A protein has these predicted regions:
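Glycine-rich, phosphate-binding/catalytic loops in enzymes
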Residues: 93
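N-terminal, polar/charged subdomain of small-to-medium soluble alpha/beta proteins
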Residues: 1-89, 97, 104-150
Length: 150
């Protein structure tokens, strides 16, 4: 499971001209699911995302988490995080999980992150053509992969 975490002042996702979800200060998370991902990957990633300290404290040091600042989260499914570009110039997504695997894990991630933060998280719509708008803060962008826990 992979996520790209962007610290934002605000973000929203629009589908067919209608805003589906919007948040204020917090994280926009692009989430990709791989065929071999499990609930254990969800649990590890939720713990890391909720506890990640990339918001400034009173001294201007990145020392506060999303939970600490009572921030919001917007989670958007993103199978293209598993693009393979080894052969040729057209990416392949053979490592991205099938719909049957990825939808339940995406929903589990959103539910568990909501529980960890004590508030609902915004979501996109799985498989939809979405327009994502954000105002990066910093910018601070972090990539996490449950198969590479560095």
């Amino acid at each position: 499971m992979r996520t790209v975490i962007q610290r934002v002042q605000h973000a929203s996702v629009t589908i067919d001209g209608t805003v589906k979800s919007s948040i204020g200060k917090g994280y926009l998370l692009l989430l990709g699911v791989e065929e071999s991902d499990t609930s254990e990957d969800v649990d590890w990633l939720v713990r890391k995302v909720a506890a990640l300290r990339v918001f400034d404290d009173d001294n201007g040091v990145m020392n506060r988490s999303l939970f600490d600042i009572q921030g919001e989260a917007l989670v958007v499914s993103q199978f293209t995080l598993y693009a393979s570009y080894k052969k040729g110039n057209r990416p392949s997504w053979f490592r991205a999980a099938s719909h049957e695997i990825s939808v339940p894990l995406y929903e589990e991630f959103c539910s568990k992150l909501s529980e960890a933060l004590g508030k609902p998280v915004g979501t996109g719509e799985f498989g939809a053509d979405m327009k994502v708008e954000l105002l990066n803060d910093g910018p601070v962008t972090i990539c996490m992969d449950t198969k590479n826990k560095e």
